[in-house]
UniProtKB/Swiss-Prot annotation:
Site-annotated residues for Part of a proton relay during catalysis: T44, Y107
Molecular function terms, GO-annotated: 4-hydroxy-tetrahydrodipicolinate synthase activity
Reaction equations catalysed: L-aspartate 4-semialdehyde + pyruvate = (2S,4S)-4-hydroxy-2,3,4,5-tetrahydrodipicolinate + H2O + H(+)
Organism expressing this protein natively: Pseudomonas savastanoi pv. phaseolicola (strain 1448A / Race 6) (Pseudomonas syringae pv. phaseolicola (strain 1448A / Race 6))
Protein name (Swiss-Prot/TrEMBL): 4-hydroxy-tetrahydrodipicolinate synthase
Residues that coordinate or bind pyruvate: T45, I203
Function summary: Catalyzes the condensation of (S)-aspartate-beta-semialdehyde [(S)-ASA] and pyruvate to 4-hydroxy-tetrahydrodipicolinate (HTPA).
Location(s), subcellular: Cytoplasm
Annotated CDD domains: DHDPS (cd00950)
Family: Belongs to the DapA family.
Quaternary data: Homodimer.
Pathway of action: Amino-acid biosynthesis; L-lysine biosynthesis via DAP pathway; (S)-tetrahydrodipicolinate from L-aspartate: step 3/4
Domain of life: Bacteria
Length: 292
């Protein structure tokens, strides 16, 4: 079972927006050393929208090779074209990914039946574990619990990243699926409570900069130690809030640069973190113990 702290890994770039393979390698090592339970490559935080297909598959291939089976690698392969999502998912399987994360189609706003057919088609076309991803704040598409319940019985669909931040939504999904269907948080601010409800982990932006703390939080929450989990959550709250002071992954890439983990690089239309946000994020890193 894929569970625990799953980092939504950034894709390091230089100042010209070229992929920085050396920094990527060092970030993977950082997570292996700090207790991260799985790596999600080229998802939203990994800037999948601005990577071309060859770059997309090369990031996955390199992460898989470096991890070498020590923890699961989940590849972001969602698209708003079903045909393209099948292609990306096939490529990820060929590259050795353990599972794929598929965001709901964005911009074209399919119906609930369209969502069911989209994800069912991909699951039937590519034999690899697949995780649904619902983040309506980014996609303008909200997959309802009834649709999730229908999809939960489709072969190869093993779980969902629920990123609405709505705990009632998580409760509704948990109540409508079997116990072996994995419900993950995709919202750092509410992740601890979702896991205490029965969720199996957190696909986390905050884990990029605080992997050990997020791993400890997830472990405590999943064993039912609410006191410990909530105490760690309180420590991380400044980061959970400030890492979204501008659009993700702008702040987290700046934070990793501030930590000396990667160059100052991001691709248009995203831009580097505005100067007014530097000190608030620096203070959050200090308050959470990431910077001294």
């Amino acid at each position: 079972m894929i569970a625990g702290s799953m980092v939504a890994l950034v894709t390091p770039m230089d100042a010209q927006g070229r992929l920085d393979w050396d920094s990527l390698s060092k970030l993977v090592d950082f997570h292996l050393q700090e207790g991260t339970n799985a790596i999600v490559a080229v998802g939203t935080t990994g800037e999948s929208a601005t990577l071309d297909v060859s770059e997309h598959i090369e990031v996955i291939r390199r992460v898989v090779a470096q991890v070498a089976g020590r923890i699961p690698v989940i590849a972001g392969t969602g698209a708003n074209s079903t045909r393209e999502a099948v292609e990306l998912t096939t490529n990820a399987k060929t590259a050795g990914a353990d599972a794929c994360l598929l965001v709901t189609p964005y911009y074209n706003k399919p119906t609930q039946e369209g969502l069911f057919q989209h994800f069912s088609h991909i699951a039937n076309a590519v034999d690899i574990p697949q995780i649904l991803y619902n983040v309506p704040g980014r996609t303008a598409c909200d997959m309802l619990p009834e649709t999730v319940a229908r999809l939960s019985t489709v072969k190869n669909i093993i779980g969902i990243k629920e990123a609405t931040g709505n705990l009632q939504r998580a409760k509704d999904i948990l109540a409508s699926v079997s116990s072996d269907f994995l419900v993950y948080s995709g919202d750092d601010a509410t992740a601890v409570e979702l896991m205490l409800l029965g969720g199996k982990g957190n696909i986390s932006v905050t884990a990029n900069v605080a992997p050990r703390l997020m791993s400890d939080l997830c472990a405590a929450a999943m064993r039912g130690d609410a006191e410990t989990a909530r105490a760690i959550h309180e420590k991380l709250m400044p980061l959970n809030n400030t890492l979204f002071i501008e659009s993700n992954p702008i702040p987290v890439k700046w934070a990793l640069h501030e930590m000396g983990k990667m160059p100052a690089g991001i691709r248009l239309p995203l831009t580097w973190l505005s100067e007014a946000c530097h000190e608030p994020l620096r203070q959050a890193l200090r308050q959470s113990g990431v910077l001294v």
